[in-house]
Amino acid sequence: MTRKEVVLAVTAATITAVAAGVLMGRWIRRKERRLKHTQRILRKFARECATPVSKLWAVADALVADMTASLTAECCGSLNMLVSFTGSLPSGDEKGVHYGVNLRGKELLLLRGTLGGNEEPISDVQKHEIPIPDDVLNGSFKELCDFISLELVKFLAMNPGGEAEEVKNLGFTLTRSVEQIGSHSISSIHRKSLANDDDEKVLKDLVNDMNESLETHGLKIRMNTALVDNTIGELAGGRYYHKDTVAAVSLGMGTNAAYIEQAQEISRWKSAIREPQEIVVSTEWGDFRSCHLPITEFDASLDAESLNPGHRIFEKMVSGRYLGEIVRRVLLKMSEESALFGDTLPPKLTIPYILWSPDMAAMHQDISEERETVNKKLKEVFGIMDSTLAAREVVVEVCDVVAERAARLAGAGIVGMIKKLGRLEKKMSIVIVEGGLYDHYRVFRNYLHSSVWEMLGDELSDHVVIEHSHGGSAAGALFLAACGDGHQDSESK
């Protein structure tokens, strides 16, 4: 090779190296710019979701105001609370075998359990989950009653023993995921507030339909309590174990809270309530809305595109049905504006409600160095096969912001209920919490507990005890069955 050729080769190599260096520098700078933009989106989102103690108290006070308004006026505030005439709650002395039914969306859960009295734990709990056929879902309530009765016959045949000659009580609860199922659907019946005689008659007719069906199928089981939200069943379970149980909260796919109110505080339904009497109230707090709620652009777009825009605002911020969707929307914006997952937008990231709260919880609670669970879930859920560690860290941070806000708002709701009862400084108050978010999402649960402690401080926080539900999912129906005296009985006395 001649001297000239050598010079040309060296020059070409130098130019190539310089060009490669320039391109590499541009790539690095572009990557840094994208990461900075991602961080800006994250910081803005976290700032808008922030729930300092002052914000939590503002939310709690607004909830108290709406609860008070709902008890005194027909249309005032964001809540339309429901009074549940479940009769006397358990005392802890109840004994024997009891039966329960829990209607949860398109599924039916049948239960049987034994209470030993003396506040002994429920035992021998047997459960059987059954899908409800579409024709039954879209049929009349009588058709649903016949389906339930037939399945109860099978359930007892599969689980023999414990039957007696006397008629047993049946508790019937509805989980928040219940959907509209026909013109006489459970979901529409559940929202009856017993505000007038027609509504009361509807509920009595439902109980009668169920009992007629049970008798027709030869079952020595009768429904003596009204159809109630599952949260009220959990409250009954809490009362069985401790007389200081005053409220119950459901934090699963949906959310609700129920508490025990004094009859003299309820003027809206005064003609239907005899005093003195403790009344169980379903707050329907999923409908709660307030200017103090930390609503972001992602919450606003989720609500606008939902099937019920403008409604269930609190539920859309705290329940398992929506938390994963909020995370998805944030990640989508990051992917569109800062190429979080590369230059090509992952198609599945654009699919609404593809990310469920269990997957979100798994990513959030991943403590491995390489965020291996996050990597696995990104592949499984979104089809993102090649994510960087930095991107996976961002995913965890987004999950943390969403979960922390939800849990702390739920904690503020709990404090608000206790404040409404005037028990913050005076008495021990036990609140039962049930649902997948609380039961299986450890970080969410910790955030909820810490928010209550932060709001109340060392001294007052000792007065509020938060406990898991008793007997497992939907066991509240069994405790309602143990109550014995239901709405029908109380009306006939």
Swiss-Prot record:
D-glucose binds at S193, N256, E284, E315. Disulfide bonds: none annotated. One of its GO terms (cellular component) is membrane. It comes from the Eukaryota. One of its GO terms (molecular function) is D-glucose binding. Residues 36-482 form the Hexokinase domain. It is found in: Membrane. GO terms for biological process: DNA damage response; glycolytic process; hexose metabolic process; intracellular glucose homeostasis; response to cold; response to heat; response to osmotic stress; response to oxidative stress. Residues 229-471 are annotated as: Hexokinase large subdomain. It is a single-pass membrane protein. The keyword DNA repair does not apply. The chain crosses the membrane at residues 5-25. Its main location: membrane. Fructose and glucose phosphorylating enzyme. This is Probable hexokinase-like 2 protein. It comes from Arabidopsis thaliana.
